[in-house]
Amino acid sequence: MQIEASEGDNVWAINRNHDIYRYSGISWQHISGKLSQISSGDAGVWGLTLAGTCYYRPYTYEDYPSTGGNWQVVSSSPQMKWLASGTGVVVGVAKSGDLYYRSGVNVASPKGRGWVKVPNVSGMRQVDVFHSMVMGVDTSGRIKYSLIKQ
């Protein structure tokens, strides 16, 4: 189960059955699909399945208050276990624990071009992103941070 709120008043949630919901300000709206993790931010709404398949929700870039279009598969090589959507950047933790960012994420190409490994950052479990600063927790429980330079 997870709940995710963005600066743009977008609230998304996943229940224990991996069903997806978006809060409309009045009620919860069921969204098609099944996810294990979701992130909402200026770079749009992104999600992961248990198998590590990565999805992007079109028409949600710039934290647009909408349910968006249908989920689109994003190249998940490497397979991810955690995603975070920020201002013009999406970061992911691979199942290996390595940190990646999605290159070329912008309004014209909201899914970006591909995953780029962040050097000297490994053993990560979970991350979040604020502008170009990534903060996360590694597998030992230590907090780490990195700047993403695209």
How should these model regions be labeled?
Residues 1-2, 6, 10, 16-41, ...:
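Trp- and S/T/G-rich repeat-edge/linker motifs of beta-rich repeat architectures
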Residues 10-14, 44-48, 89-93, 133-137:
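Short beta-strand elements that form the blades of beta-propeller/WD-repeat-like
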